[in-house]
Structure formats: structure tokens, C-alpha cells
């Protein structure tokens, strides 16, 4: 049986992609940094404000990836920009489409300086009323959460603001979400409005271990004169880097999600090892102090359901006690299988009992519908070596998919 459909990524009129040249990118620069870059290349001071406004509009509103498409920019200026800078997209190594419409891109970024090309994954999840893009912040991860596939890939490096934003730009390219663009044939997407209406920093890596680049990327993504995403439609998920939580609310101002997964320190030390450094009391205290926290701006607590590990009603009672006084929503996540894991997903009946108990205590407790499992795009499954999975592992994964099929019905 085939568990995925790979689609052709070499279509005509595709956005310009990186060729590996080490020109600096204008993507991800603040207006001040862009102005400084133009000034350094000899652009007259009296023109800089206008040129920055033009570039900002072409890059983030019109979505161009080639300076030659900037029709209101003088030809000599375009030639200078082409000579010294790039606005190209990352290379699409592979694009996969799940049976449920979820899309996963394996993206390759060129070497910068003494570095080497790196690969990351981004995932698009379409729903009737919205489209959510799951963005990566690091290549690999240091956290080694025991149930998470990404945690089995060592950290290579942080992504730059350019590389974080490029995931959003590329997704909008591929989905026809910029002006005068068409969506691919047969694409499952929201019926109206933006194709990418929400972004979640829930891909590969821990965003708060890459705070400065994530901050800059999200401030550009929510800039009203560019990509214009609402901060209420941007969610940053952390495993609990306590010192950076307050800064996230104060300096970025987006919605916060916490990868919780356990209500006892002894268990969370195993599932989410960062808990040894920042235990539950410190984490919850930081959540209570999150700027802007209210019933209208609740914190989302993510809780993966692991059979006979954290899914008892005693755990549910502990969860309610732990979150007392925190405006919260609790996302229950059926565990998504990946090759080599020793964990199993809780029985569906137990997940529903757990959810009902939480709900009766006054907390919204939606059960997240597993999306993109068949292409390793679901929560906890991302890993950029996935395209090199051995045949035996793929067969094992297909067997797991068949065994778990009933859990999603």
C-alpha cells in the first residue's frame, strides 16, 4: 500500500529558488536593516525610505521571488539588487500530500558562510474555515522529548529569520495565496479567505532557544503593511523555556502554547526532559504572569495521550489542579506513531473519558484530529531525514498505520 502521494514540484512559473549562491537575502531583515543594506550598496539617502517601502510591498504583499518582477523599480536598481542580494525561496526537495489534504514540504536552505546546506520540514493543515502552517525554528532539536520523532534528530543549528519566514512565503507560493496566483489543481483548502490564515511555531525545534530570530520573523509576519497576519492567529509553542516566556508575550505578543504532557515532575522529567531544569511549578508561575493573559487570550496546553503512561483519570484530576487559576484550553493529542517508538496511543474510549472529565471542570478540551499521519506530518513526527527512511522502516510504519486506523474513525 502507498502511504503518500508525492507531487511534481517542477511546475512552470515556479517561484525562483536558491541556487546555493551566498548572496545575502533581503527576506527577514527589519526595515532598518534593509535600509542599511541599501545604503551600503550606494543607494542615495533620499531614496532609501521609498526603496524600502517598495521592496517590502513586493516581497511581503505581492510575494515576488525575482527582482525582475518589481515593475515599478528602475532597471538599474533591479540590476544592483540582483548583483548583491537574493529574495529566492528555499529548494523544495520533496512535497507530499496526505489523503486528508495535509501537505508536507522538505526544504533545503543553501550554505551560508562556513555552513553547509540544511533541510527542514514545514506542514500545511487545511480546514474548512482556516489553513494552518506549522513552521520549524531549528534544524533538529536539543530537547530529546521521548515521544517525539524530531527529538531523535540532533540539533544542527538555529534557523535564521529569513529561513523561518521563507517557510511562510513558500507555502503561500505553493497554495496560490499571493495576488494573481492560482492554487494547484485538486488542492484541499479553506473555501474562502486566506489559504494560510494561521501559523504555529510547532515544527522542528524549540522556538525559545532561537528567540531573536523567531521574534524578528514573527514581527515581520504580523506587520500590517506586509504579510499582515493577526497576532491572535499566531501561536508559539514551547516545551517550557521559562526565562523566555514573559519576553515572548512582552516583545512578540502572540498566543502561547505549552507542551505539557504530564502533571507530575517525575513523569515530565522523562517525557519532556527540560522539566529537570524548569519544573512544573516554575512553568505554571511563568504562565500565570504571561502578558495579556485573559479568558479571551488563553494559553493552550498540549497533552499527548500515551496509553498507560499519562492517560488515567488521576492524571486528569491532576491536570485540573495544576492549571487552577490559569485561563487555559487543553488540546488532547492522540499519540502519532513513528518507526522505532515504544509508546502507544491511548484507546479512543479512554481519550474521550479524559476529555469529558476535563470539560466538566470547565476547560475546553478538544481532541485534536490526527492530520497527515500517512506522510509523517502529524504532531511529533517531523524529522528532516524522513525522506531517507529505510524500506524496512517504511513497511513497519505502514503496518502501524493499519493497526491504528480504527483510532481515527
Curated annotation (Swiss-Prot):
It is an enzyme of class 2 (transferase). S-adenosyl-L-methionine binds at residues 205-206, 237, 259-261, 336. It is found in: Cytoplasm. Its EC number is 2.1.1.192. InterPro entries: Aldolase_TIM, Methyltransferase_A, RlmN_N, RNA_MTrfase_RlmN, rRNA_lsu_MTrfase_RlmN/Cfr, rSAM. It catalyses: adenosine(2503) in 23S rRNA + 2 reduced [2Fe-2S]-[ferredoxin] + 2 S-adenosyl-L-methionine = 2-methyladenosine(2503) in 23S rRNA + 5'-deoxyadenosine + L-methionine + 2 oxidized [2Fe-2S]-[ferredoxin] + S-adenosyl-L-homocysteine; adenosine(37) in tRNA + 2 reduced [2Fe-2S]-[ferredoxin] + 2 S-adenosyl-L-methionine = 2-methyladenosine(37) in tRNA + 5'-deoxyadenosine + L-methionine + 2 oxidized [2Fe-2S]-[ferredoxin] + S-adenosyl-L-homocysteine. The keyword Signal does not apply. Binds 1 [4Fe-4S] cluster. The cluster is coordinated with 3 cysteines and an exchangeable S-adenosyl-L-methionine. CDD domains: Radical_SAM. This is Dual-specificity RNA methyltransferase RlmN. The lineage of its organism: Bacteria, Pseudomonadati, Pseudomonadota, Alphaproteobacteria, Hyphomicrobiales.
